[in-house]
Design a protein with these regions (language model features):
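Short active-site loop/helix that positions an aromatic residue
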Residues: 282-286
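Conserved small/polar residues in nucleotide/adenosyl-binding loops
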Residues: 287-294
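Conformational gate/switch positions in structured elements
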Residues: 277-279
Length: 294
């Protein structure tokens, strides 16, 4: 009863991605091997090495770019391609696919393929709330294609450049966000267990303060034990009112909500469960294959 559906645009005004922070912050740490010229994601290079050389106190996701470079050099982590340990410094690689609209290829005509479905929900928040007459709390959900220019796609359909994503943006009162975060965290866990994913192959990992995204108050990742190691299936995040506030700032459009019962205005907080459909399908294929073998 709380939620409604949406099918938002894949190509949106490029200022949407400026407001959301994707143009400046949606980056992966790219590092090159000087010997064989192979390119790697620095964090994945370290994680691959740690899988064979466990160091429980090391949290890769909390590392800065400088810390990752220092760790790679201190541990003499080898290049998977040539075995040598001679890497460049890290440089930022933006994950958004860029294209051009119209007949001229100048910067004024640049647009992006959406890297997530969430922003299409945020920019339509007021339109949806008014037309559906929904009262807070309520959610807007959609399933659709997202696109990311991954540095190192691989592991079959786990990391690909075009993928199917399911996201729910659940809007709530600011003081109730952590309660709803716990609710959706529990809901997602039960949903995955309903697919017969066994607890020994499924874990919940709460982000430490140092690794939280800049917009997040709390985040939990649901990770599955794939043959290549633990990988994220689903993330649940408390995005606070960051996104709506940013779009209000950049667009000049009012994004607040008037609570008639309390006679007050506020910008809603958002709880976001974000699921990669392809990854869940891969996990299901793997554990059903294991069951058949047994």
């Amino acid at each position: 009863p709380y939620n409604v559906g949406l099918d938002s645009a894949i190509l949106m005004n490029p200022q949407v991605w400026v407001a959301s922070g994707h143009v400046t912050t949606f980056n992966d740490p790219l590092i090159d091997c000087k010997s064989c010229k192979m390119r790697h994601r620095a964090d994945k290079l370290i994680e691959g090495w740690l899988a064979e050389n466990p160091m429980p106190d090391v949290n890769v996701e909390a590392m800065t770019n400088d810390e990752m470079v220092a760790f790679i050099r201190a541990q003499q982590i080898p290049c998977p391609g040539c075995g040598k340990s001679d890497f460049t410094d890290i440089r930022k690689f933006n994950l958004m696919f860029k294209t051009h609209q119209g007949v001229t290829e100048d910067t004024a005509a640049e647009v992006y393929l959406r890297p997530e479905t969430a922003q299409g929900i945020f920019v339509n928040f007021k339109n949806i709330q008014r037309t559906t007459r929904r009262k807070i709390p309520f959610g807007v959900c959609q399933i659709g294609k997202s696109f990311r220019n991954e540095i190192t796609p691989g592991n079959f359909i786990f990391r690909i450049r075009e993928f199917e994503q399911m996201e729910l943006e659940f809007f709530c009162e600011p003081d109730t966000d952590l309660e709803w975060f716990d609710y959706w965290r529990s809901f997602c866990h039960e949903w995955l267990k309903g697919l017969n994913m066994h607890d020994e192959n499924l874990r919940l990992r709460d982000h430490e303060k140092e690794e939280l995204s800049f917009y997040s108050k709390a985040t939990t990742d649901f990770e599955y034990l794939f043959p290549f190691g633990w990988g994220e299936l689903w993330g649940v995040a408390d995005r606070t009112n960051y996104d709506l506030s940013q779009h209000q700032k950049f667009s000049g459009q009012d994004m607040d909500y008037f609570d008639q019962e309390k006679n007050e205005h506020y910008i809603p907080y958002v709880i976001e469960p974000s699921l990669g459909c392809d990854r869940v399908a891969l996990a299901c294929l793997l554990y059903t294959s294991d069951a058949a073998d047994d």
